[in-house]
Amino acid sequence: MSGGRRKEEPPQPQLANGALKVSVWSKVLRSDAAWEDKDEFLDVIYWFRQIIAVVLGVIWGVLPLRGFLGIAGFCVINAGVLYLYFSNYLQIDEEEYGGTWELTKEGFMTSFALFMVIWIIFYTAIHYD
């Protein structure tokens, strides 16, 4: 018996219908990416919205923004950035995914709740006397 270890083979790339499967995150940044799976694209929209919520929550908390101006600013930026992403950058047909409104509201309330929590935590930690 030899004391050598077995060399593990690197994992093979995943195949989908005989073609190489492209990573979801590599498709996010490519404007010419094809989204065959509707749920995969909606997941990207959902998580992109959560990232925006965290970033804006931190910024709004560090800046002394309060009240309606902060909430309205979040809603406009969150919806606007995602609308520009899927309509102008990706240039997808919104009707394939349920229309513009369906994509605009995908994960919005969850991101709004996350934004509020992050905003309150940072604002309280920095500006509370």
UniProtKB/Swiss-Prot annotation:
Coiled coil: none annotated. It is found in: Endoplasmic reticulum membrane; Mitochondrion inner membrane. Residues 66, 128-129 are lumenal. Residues 1-44, 85-103 are cytoplasmic. Its main location: endoplasmic reticulum. GO terms for cellular component: endoplasmic reticulum membrane; mitochondrial inner membrane; multi-pass translocon complex. Pfam families: EMC6. InterPro entries: EMC6-like (IPR029008), RCAF1 (IPR010742). It comes from the Eukaryota. The chain crosses the membrane at residues 45-65, 67-84, 104-127. It is a multi-pass membrane protein. Component of the multi-pass translocon (MPT) complex that mediates insertion of multi-pass membrane proteins into the lipid bilayer of membranes. The MPT complex takes over after the SEC61 complex: following membrane insertion of the first few transmembrane segments of proteins by the SEC61 complex, the MPT complex occludes the lateral gate of the SEC61 complex to promote insertion of subsequent transmembrane regions. Within the MPT complex, the GEL subcomplex may mediate insertion of transmembrane regions into the membrane. PANTHER family: GEL COMPLEX SUBUNIT OPTI (PTHR12906:SF0), PROTEIN C20ORF24 RAB5-INTERACTING PROTEIN (PTHR12906). Belongs to the EMC6 family. This is GEL complex subunit OPTI. The lineage of its organism: Eukaryota, Metazoa, Chordata, Craniata, Vertebrata. The gene is RAB5IF.
